[in-house]
Amino acid sequence: MTIKKSLLILTMLVPGALMAEDTQCNGVLKGSHDNVIVPESAVCTLQNARLNGSVYVKRGGALTIQGRTYVNGNVISEDGGRYVRITGTNVRIGGNVQMKYNYDTNAIQPGTTIQGSLQYVENTGALFVTGVFIGSDLQLFKNSGGATLMNNTIRQNMQCKENTPAPSGSGNVAGDKEDQCRAL
């Protein structure tokens, strides 16, 4: 029997065993988990946690990531979340951080590493990003809450378009700075 056939049979016999489990978060969450869901209007704090999957913030939900927290996947708030605040001194995001339609102040503070991209699109809440390493692109498009970008390292591009007001800041290093990010 080949390995593929063995895995197929195992998957058929134990369908839930190979799938990541979702943990609902409303309050403080520590320890190891697969995917984490922040339900509508819930306030979740990940503190010294290790996630094998991603974090999903639902409409009106709020997420704070503190301490030595590692998220293997993405942090996604694209359904009108309240905010995402990453305040730990050693937070690692293995994928992307995506925020869309958030309406409160969002912040990513020094000591944070985002291996993928930071995408901040059509938000009415302000964004503060200071002393962050981003392994791919930083993209800010069509935001109305303002953004301050200070002393960040972006491996690829800083792209800022159609933000009112335009982002402010200085000391950022990027492969290429485009449009409203050019002077930052």
Label the predicted regions.
Residues E21-T23, N74-S77, Q156-C160, L184:
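Sequence-structural signature of mature extracellular/luminal beta-sheet repeat domains
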Residues G27-V28, A183:
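Solvent-exposed adhesion/ligand-recognition segments of exported proteins
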Residues G27, D34-V36, A42, Q47, ...:
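The right-handed parallel beta-helix/beta-solenoid scaffold, focusing on the short coil/turn
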Residues K5-V14:
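Sec-dependent N-terminal signal peptides
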Residues S170-L184:
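Short, low-complexity, Pro/Ser/Thr/Gly-rich segments in the mature regions of secreted, periplasmic
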Residues M1-I3:
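N-terminal secretory signal peptides that target proteins for export/translocation
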Residues P15-A20:
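N-terminal signal peptide c-region/cleavage motif recognized by signal peptidases
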